[in-house]
Amino acid sequence: MSYADSNGIAFYYDEHGEGAPLVLLHGGIGSGQMFASLAPALANRRRVIAIDLQGHGRTADVDRPFDVAAMADDVAGVIEQPGGTVDLLVYSLGGKVALRLALQHPERVNDLILVSIAIKRSGNHAEAIAAMDAMTPAAAEFIKPSPPGQFYAANAPQPEAWETLIAKTSDAIKHDYDWTDEVRGLRPRTLLVFADADSVRPAHIVEFYGLLGGGLADAGWDGSNQPANRLAIMPGRTHYDILDSALLAPVVEAFLLR
């Protein structure tokens, strides 16, 4: 097992392959195990590093809320050790952390692949917001039989902290946020990836891509007006299974090879 220290926390990370580092950040209550089907495909060309965030997976929790700005600083400290500057492929909560990382520490990030993330809370469908609001500490026992719950019980250094994980996640996802103005100045070259039945509203996807210079004009017959940033939609997928799409790895590889 591999660990890297940052801000007083020992962060677990799983590593596959060789080459330029590609860091993966998972979604809420999950772990790097969320990328189990994707990481081996990406490791054919890259050194893939899946980090377990604070209080998730094999990384122990500390007396601190799940604040994405602080978690971004954590990741900045971790990636100083594998090479300093990395590409990032990130999902859901991990996407929020990575977006803050790219805004707070732009010198650490080359390319950024954001999977199923809204840049403001209202960018999610009403049903998704209602589901976030329904995730309370009282739901911990109900969620425990889920794959993330089973993985946590078997692998977490403090499996008895499951209710704390749910409570902190519950608090974090209820906070309103709007990063629209900051995203306009996002520096890393960025690929946005969404499912065609995502928890993020289609109108918000268009808005997000537009803030990155995408979809504002025709690219021209020769593609000379094509934006540097990209948008991909995974067909037949949802927010909850998008990482299992067979199309995701080739889309990511094509973007990184540009």
Describe every region a protein language model picked out:
Residues L186, L192-F194:
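Short beta-strand/loop motif that positions the catalytic acidic residue
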Residues A197-R201, H239-Y240:
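Acidic catalytic loop of the alpha/beta-hydrolase fold
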Residues A232-A246:
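Catalytic histidine-centered segment of alpha/beta-hydrolase-like enzymes
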